[in-house]
Amino acid sequence: PPRSTLFPYTTLFRSVLNSRLMDRPLRPLFPKGFFNDVQVVATVMCMDNDAPSEIAAMIGSSVALSVSDIPWEGPTGSVLVGRIDGEFVINPTSAEREKSDMHMVVSGTKEAIMMVEAGAEEVAESDMLDGIMFAHEEIKKIVAFIEEVVEEVGKAKKEIECYKVPEDIENDVREYAEEKMRAAVLTVEKQERLDNMDAVEVETQEHFAEKYPEGEKDIANILYTITKEQVRRLILDDCIRPDNRKHEEIRPIWVETGVLPRCHGTGLFKRGQTQALSVATLGPVGEGQRLDGISEETEKRYMHHYNFPAYSVGETKPMRSPGRREIGHGALAERAIVPVLPEVEEFPYAIRVVSDRKSTRLNSSHVSQS
């Protein structure tokens, strides 16, 4: 297809990915029970290609939330990690990024890592872990700086009062339903497991309907908490997933190729209740996608576009242009596949893959890469 119509959000592509980078380390640090809308806007006023704007935006967002009166359990720091000739580099310049075999954004607090997003050229897992630890040392310095700023100009945080389920209801529900929910969570087949979990909730609600006539929401919240605790305990303590699989086991995978005879390449991938149809199309190298934004203009020879139609989860909604989720998941697949593509001299084609979800149960982004 013509270059201009390859992707409807060409100019916003990088902004969408950067906003997702900003969001992921910030969102988990808002306290449970805080339901106010919070909007963080990062605007690039001036651009230096040697200083990644996304890192400045992530740190700036952390500073803004930290000095405000908004309840938030930051601050966080963020860095870009590269690796050149086996040596890690913090926030590499544009020229250094060209030589780096790793591009990893790490964000965290003083105590823990909050987010990692990376692309690498077949780098060993141990090296990636070393890179994360290297980044965390720099993050601690950034957090210390932000804490100094907060001490000087920060506002007192607003106090929020969260509703707490009455202790007697929680104790009764746990005593009655905890083991039942554990047994339901261990059901092997997914739909049957969900049905069993729903049955436990219905049974529990009926059991306590007379004793706690206005406690339906409280009981539902307690059961949700019990489910999370059981899943977490099974995984961390017993190394068992909710469907009785060990942590190294995967569900059966089914793949069929050549599904559409007129296309250059097609693959239908199925795992559990998730299915995806991916279609690959080849074109001249000149039909690659040009990314023209505030940073250096670049071209992509490989384009991976991810579609998540409402029907794949049994819903209806207007069919619009790709949203943040689709753009982000397409970029995730690109990051995994580009490093293993043959060089352009060996394979002089532009490649476009479109992955459509046909049926989805929980996470489906990884299916695009398969």
Which residues make up each language-model segment?
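Single conserved hydrophobic/aromatic residue that forms the stacking wall/gate
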Residues: 1-11, 358, 362-370
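Glycine-rich, flexible beta-strand/loop modules in the N-terminal catalytic cores of phosphate-handling
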Residues: 8-39, 44, 51, 110, ...
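Alpha/propeptide regions of enzymes that mature by internal proteolysis
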Residues: 10-31, 35-41, 51-59, 64-67, ...
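Flexible, glycine/charged-enriched surface loops at secondary-structure junctions
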Residues: 32-38, 73-75, 142-160, 191-192, ...
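Conserved phosphate/anionic-ligand binding catalytic regions in large, soluble enzymes, centered on
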Residues: 51-69, 255-280, 359-361, 368
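Extended, hydrophobic alpha-helical segments in both membrane/secreted and soluble proteins
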Residues: 61, 328-337, 349, 353-361, ...
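Mobile "lid/hinge" segments at catalytic clefts and subdomain interfaces of large enzymes
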Residues: 69-188
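Extended amphipathic alpha-helical scaffolds
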Residues: 158-298
